[in-house]
């Protein structure tokens, strides 16, 4: 499988950051009935289990989440881009990763649920992840993205993809794994996100992230989803447990709307209060965790064009720069570099490249998924 994507015409990019972050637990051990959407007896023999790659036992008891799984978060490992594509190398990779997470980070076990090697081998990460995938109803609480560890399946991909694209073998297997996860947990192709959508990190890498629209299309096709079943916009559901550039964009937009909040990317108490107040004032259901729901985003983000300026333009420029558009600077003016970057982003997501930031373009810009990205390319 070859992932179709627009050719690059740029980039000076920064070095890679680590793909896994400190653990934050969401959810607890609460037994629930198996989900009706799971496929009992699904063939998962192609996934190399912890026993098969000779994993160490966990250092502490592991927990199963009590809240529903609602997304997949894709990472790069920030490991070398090796040319050894063998299964033996993949097993050693899994052992090395577990050693790093347990001995270096002090975690109980491997942080992510699954690992994909550059050779396309798929391995179980955290103990119990394969059993939970087979059941399809309750995931293991992981350590791959603070704030999302109890509701997001984490997939680490071998390599560093700030300036390089993952090999086809990896992309093919990642699409297969994501498709299987979606089938078992009742998810969709539009539920696939990147680590930096919920955390301040360079993971999964700008070049890998450009492959995400094509990755989602591949999963969409394998699932046999109808275009009409895809929401017009699937926004990143940031909430008070996460942080990073997307949170900072929300803070900038809240500032534009008149709120006094620190623009730090930290989802602090002032941000929680501002989000909930905005929701109440705009007829949006107030979320107890200050989740930026679709109506919250869509009332908060103003449409922008070349006549626009100020805080929202600077917010868009900040987001573009954080995604690797190095030629974009925060001027607050809707300049040529900004329009050029917006057009490139629009083409990547199947949108008309008009250089204007509509509600739909805002969604794609902050890490969301738009229906147009699933059209035939």
Protein language model features and the residues they cover:
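Surface-exposed patches in mature extracellular/periplasmic domains of secreted proteins
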Residues: 104-113, 184-196, 262-264, 287-288, ...
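Basic/polar, cationic surfaces and motifs that engage anionic cell-wall
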Residues: 2-9, 37-77, 117-136, 141-252, ...
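A generic structural signal for short coil/turn motifs at secondary-structure boundaries
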Residues: 81-86, 162-167, 202, 262-263, ...
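C-terminal region of N-terminal signal peptides and the immediate post-cleavage residues
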Residues: 25-42
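N-terminal secretory signal peptides and thylakoid transit peptides that target proteins
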Residues: 1-24
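Short acidic, glycine/serine/threonine-rich helix-capping segments at coil-helix boundaries
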Residues: 237-298, 305-368, 375-376
